[in-house]
C-alpha cells in the first residue's frame, strides 16, 4: 500500500504530515516511529495527522506523534505547519481555523506575509497538571515564579515548570552553546519528579526582548526549534521579571516571536511554516500496515 505524505518544517523543526481525512490512518507507535526514522523511513522530529473534528464548532482534529511513536498533547511549530497544509491542500478557505488537540482547542491564523500565528492558550503552573512532583525539592521565588532545584551531573539546576498543553522545565543558562544540553537534557527529561517525562529548555537572555533557546524534547531529543518550548521559556522569563513581551526567541532553526500579557492570558506565537517536498510512502517496504 502507498500513502501520500508532505514533508514540512517550522524553524527547522521537521514533520511528516499525513491527510487522515482522505485516507483514515490508525498506526501503532512502532509504525509511527518507523516513518520518523531518518535512515529507514522518511525522517522527522514528529508526525502530524490531519483528521475530521469530532466537534461541530471546530474545523479539524490535530494529532501529533513524537519520533519514538508516542502521541503527545501539542506542538506549536507543528501547528503552524498544520494550518499551511490544510490551506495549501484546499481543505479550508478560512484564514483562521480552530483545531482540536489532545487537551483542548488551538486557534491558528495565516498572516498575509506567510507567517502563522498560533493562540497557544494560557500557560498552566499547577504541579499536578504537568504532572510534576516537587515535594522535598529546594525552592526559591523570583518575581512571580517559583523554581525548584534538581541535582543534575553534580550541578544544582533551578527549573521553572510550565505546561503549554505539554510539560516544560526551563532553566536560564549563561551560554546556550557552551551548556551541556545533550548531557543534561535526557537526565531532566526522564527525572523521577516528572512521571510523564518533560521537555527540558535551556534559555540564554540577550536583553529584555530577546533570548536564545535550546530544547531537549520529550521523546525526540534536541530539535532545531520547539514552539511550545519557546512559549514556556518566555513565560518563565516574564514571570521572573527578566523579560518583557514581545520576545524574539532565536533557535538553531530560526526565530519565533512570542507575546504574552500575563497570568490567565493566552500566549501568542508567530513564526514560519515551510513545505519542503511531497512524496509517496511505500508502507509494505516499511513493513507497515495501515488500519482503515
Curated annotation (Swiss-Prot):
Binding site residues for substrate: 13, 46, 66, 76-77, 166, 199, 217-218, 227-228
Documented EC number(s): 5.1.1.7
Functional pathway: Amino-acid biosynthesis; L-lysine biosynthesis via DAP pathway; DL-2,6-diaminopimelate from LL-2,6-diaminopimelate: step 1/1
Alphabetical list of InterPro entries matching this protein: DAP_epimerase_AS (IPR018510), DAP_epimerase_DapF (IPR001653)
Subcellular location: Cytoplasm
Swiss-Prot/TrEMBL site (Could be important to modulate the pK values of the two catalytic cysteine residues) positions: 168, 217
Ubl conjugation in keyword set: no
Function: Catalyzes the stereoinversion of LL-2,6-diaminopimelate (L,L-DAP) to meso-diaminopimelate (meso-DAP), a precursor of L-lysine and an essential component of the bacterial peptidoglycan.
Subunit structure: Homodimer.
UniProt name for this protein: Diaminopimelate epimerase
Species of the source: Ralstonia pickettii (strain 12J)
Biological classification of the source: Bacteria, Pseudomonadati, Pseudomonadota, Betaproteobacteria, Burkholderiales
Gene that this polypeptide is encoded by: dapF
